From Swiss-Prot:
InterPro entries: ATPase_NBD, Methan_mark_12. The lineage of its organism: Archaea, Methanobacteriati, Methanobacteriota, Stenosarchaea group, Methanomicrobia. Belongs to the UPF0285 family. This is UPF0285 protein Mbar_A0208.
Length: 325
């Protein structure tokens, strides 16, 4: 049996294969995927995993915001690609679209995982915001659930920061990248950003993509920032201190939500910044509790686990209804 999960990440498309007791991973940069044909993407998947597409039992796919549907369903039953609009918060490269279309047209059985939004089954108070999280974060949460945790908060900290709360195996709320805690590149629009948008200096999406902690530094990207932090350069440490503080605040807010469900839970950190030791120590100190860490592959692995369990007949994943087959 072979099950594949696909994480539509900010910088790369990550793939995970679960075959028996073995798990394998690889990634394609989004720009690299955009330059490939659909068949080249499928061939790359076959070559990296050493399998033939005809032997894949089910693929679980994530794409962009996933805000046009609210149940896990056959990818071929989606309207368009499952989005209300292609416009929104984030950079467009075409890589995710190319991978989505390659899977959709491949003939391989595939399901699409939705994001969380106002049509989702979450705490109704969270619906003050139109969108809570993109679909790949459900992959991270499901992987944690598969590790044996039923109540937890997970914060994915990288280019942006998104935090989810899970109570009794169901996701009850999340805080999206454009709402509160900044990541390296992305963050919420503050007063000056709103003025800039209103004055036509930049679009709201551009303002979102430039609202992260990187703007406090002379560095050009996440890799340069983390290298500078390893060298203990003060601008880099200030940026990571900022990210850590706001991520801890976001985690604490999700813990308050868990209390309303009469539970407390473990805290997990994910993402390329969340797994950075300096950030982990800062967040632990802010929260006064231990935090477990996940690597960058766990969204894709969790999606593969969703594919495996849906294939086995599971009708609900993290409280999200399964409408397949």
């Amino acid at each position: 049996m072979a099950f594949i999960g696909i994480d539509h990440g900010t910088t790369a498309m990550r793939f995970a294969l679960i075959e028996g007791e073995s798990t394998h991973t690889f990634e394609l940069e989004r720009a690299e995927a955009a330059a490939m044909s659909e068949n080249e993407i499928l061939t790359s998947l076959e070559e990296h995993f050493g399998i033939r597409r005809e032997t894949i039992n089910l693929i679980a796919l994530t794409y962009s915001m996933g805000d046009g549907f609210s149940t896990i369903k056959d990818v071929r039953n989606l309207e368009g690609r499952g989005l209300k609009s292609i416009e929104g918060a984030g950079k467009k490269t075409g890589g995710g679209t190319r991978v989505f279309d390659a899977i959709r047209h491949s003939g391989v059985p595939a399901i699409a995982i939705p994001g969380l939004h106002t049509e989702s089954k979450v705490d109704p108070r969270m619906k003050v915001f139109s969108h809570l999280t993109s679909p790949e974060k459900l992959g991270i949460a499901y992987h944690i659930l598969c590790l044996g945790y039923n109540n937890f908060v997970v914060s994915d900290i990288s280019s942006n920061t998104v935090t989810l709360a899970i109570a009794d195996r169901k996701v009850i709320g999340a805080i999206d990248a454009c709402i509160f805690a900044p990541g390296v590149h992305h963050g919420p629009l503050d007063l000056q950003a709103i003025r800039d948008v209103d004055n036509g200096y930049r679009t709201a999406n551009k303002a979102f993509m430039e609202a992260g902690a990187l703007k406090m530094t002379p560095y050009k990207d996440r890799d340069e920032l983390l290298l500078a932090a390893e060298d203990e350069e003060s601008p880099a440490l200030l940026a990571l201190d900022t990210i850590s503080l706001f991520a801890a605040m976001e985690i604490a807010s999700m813990q308050l939500l868990l209390k309303d469900y009469e539970t407390i839970g473990e805290v997990f950190l994910a993402g390329s910044v969340g797994e950075f030791e300096y950030v982990q120590k800062k967040i632990r100190a802010h929260l006064g509790q231990e935090c477990q860490c996940l690597g960058k592959w766990h969204a894709a692995i969790g999606c593969a686990e969703i594919a495996r369990d849906v294939f086995a007949g599971e009708k609900e994943i993290l409280g999200v209804e399964v409408n397949y087959p």
